[in-house]
UniProtKB/Swiss-Prot annotation:
This is Large ribosomal subunit protein uL18. The keyword Cytoplasm does not apply. Belongs to the universal ribosomal protein uL18 family. This is one of the proteins that bind and probably mediate the attachment of the 5S RNA into the large ribosomal subunit, where it forms part of the central protuberance. One of its GO terms (biological process) is translation. The keyword Cell membrane does not apply. It comes from Paraburkholderia phytofirmans (strain DSM 17436 / LMG 22146 / PsJN) (Burkholderia phytofirmans). Keywords: Ribonucleoprotein, Ribosomal protein, RNA-binding, rRNA-binding.
């Protein structure tokens, strides 16, 4: 079993447990250059809010910094944006789905920023 298969196995187990809870899910996906966050409905079929480093507003804010979006500063910005969008959609609490990634670095920065912006998990 290689690194990617292990991550996907962990992600699958997490999603099964979150589905049993029937709560909104904040899913994070990380690549070398970007980070993405989505809030899914409790049934898991609809995306209620999303934010990523590919958005024009985010890219403009990150333009003065080095890198495009593969750093902790970008993850912090995305965490704040996803919390604001989720609260605007009427979602106060979510279950955090790290998609099998270690809770460290950019994933942790996004989660901490979302908590500071008022999202509960």
């Amino acid at each position: 079993m290689d690194k990617t298969q292990s991550r996907l196995r962990r992600a699958r187990q997490t999603r099964i447990k979150i589905a049993e809870l029937q709560v909104a899910r904040l899913a994070v996906h990380r690549t070398n250059t970007h980070i993405y966050a989505q809030v899914f409905s409790p049934c898991g079929t609809k995306v209620l809010a999303s934010a990523s480093t590919l958005e024009a507003e985010v890219r403009a804010q990150l333009a003065d910094q080095t890198g495009k979006g593969g750093n902790v500063n970008a993850a912090t910005l995305i965490g704040k944006r996803i919390a604001e969008k989720a609260k605007a959609a009427g979602i106060e609490s979510v279950a955090f789905d790290r998609s099998g990634f270690r809770y460290h670095g950019r994933v942790k920065a996004l989660a901490d920023a979302a908590r500071e912006a008022g999202l509960k998990f």
